[in-house]
Regions:
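Glycine-rich phosphate-binding loops of nucleotide-dependent enzymes
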Residues: 1-253
Length: 253
């Protein structure tokens, strides 16, 4: 579905990512992990067009999307979240998701000021879709609650809902479990697994929460100092000596 080939990024004399290759298959959750500064978010920024690679290619299906603008990459179904929230705190949960659905719709200025029957029907459809998305992420009971009253875990779920509003084929999440307690992270994991195969075709998870990663991932890619040091199933990565050394700072015994 998505292929990363020999991807590299340099900032001046600093190599942030070096010759990294991996693929994401339809129907799987792939997690990208590594210590702080390993190059995870840099890799995500290269995939989604926020950085231009120094070398290497990014292919999505049959298309080479290397260096395309972020909006062009989003238009083909690659949607990402950011570490910094994009939630509108003054709106309700439903209002946030409905606003996001409108943002990715086809309403013109003329239609907005002179709504006809078709526009009213479209608005009703968007409202139904927004409500369905809120339910998908487990926030139906909080539908009419303002976002600034949500817990940290609920805010993260709302961020996922906003991303779903763009109609992603490949959903990419940048540290969605940051700041969550164990129960909230488990709830998030359950939502992500339910979304696979129903709302999205594949998922890329950049994450530090190892319990979440091991629970939801089909495969894991591990970066350290900008290089890929391991790739495989969760059980294999957990016992990989290079991964243990990268995280603990000492050779595995």
């Amino acid at each position: 579905m998505l292929e990363i080939g020999n991807l590299s990024k340099q900032f001046g004399g600093l190599s942030a990512l070096s010759d990294v290759s991996f693929g994401i298959r339809k129907g799987e959750i792939l997690s990208l992990i590594g210590p702080n500064g390993a190059g995870k978010t840099t890799c995500l920024n290269l995939i989604t067009g926020f950085y231009t690679p120094s070398a290497g290619r990014v292919r999505y299906g049959d298309a080479d999307i290397t260096g395309r603008a972020p909006y062009a990459i989003a238009q083909v179904g690659l949607i990402r979240t950011f570490q910094k929230t994009n939630v509108l705190k003054g709106l309700t949960v439903f209002g946030n998701v409905l606003t996001a659905r409108h943002r990715h719709g086809d309403t013109s200025v003329l239609r907005a000021f002179f709504p006809g029957k078709a526009q009213r029907q479209r608005e009703e459809r968007l409202r139904d879709e927004a409500a369905a998305i809120v339910e998908q992420v487990g926030l139906a009971a909080r539908m009419n609650v303002e976002a600034d009253s949500l817990s940290c875990g609920e805010l993260r779920l709302l961020e996922v809902a906003i991303a779903l509003s763009a109609g992603p084929r490949l959903l990419m999440l940048d540290e969605p479990a940051a700041g969550l307690n164990t129960q909230e992270a488990q709830q998030l994991g359950g939502v992500l697994k339910r979304l696979m195969g129903t709302s999205v075709e594949a998922m890329l998870l950049v994450e530090h929460n190892m319990a979440l990663v091991m629970e939801v991932s089909d495969r894991i890619v591990v970066l350290n100092f900008g290089r890929k040091i391991a790739e495989g199933a969760p059980a294999d990565v957990r016992n990989n000596s290079a991964v243990i050394e990268a995280y603990l700072g000492m050779p595995a015994t």
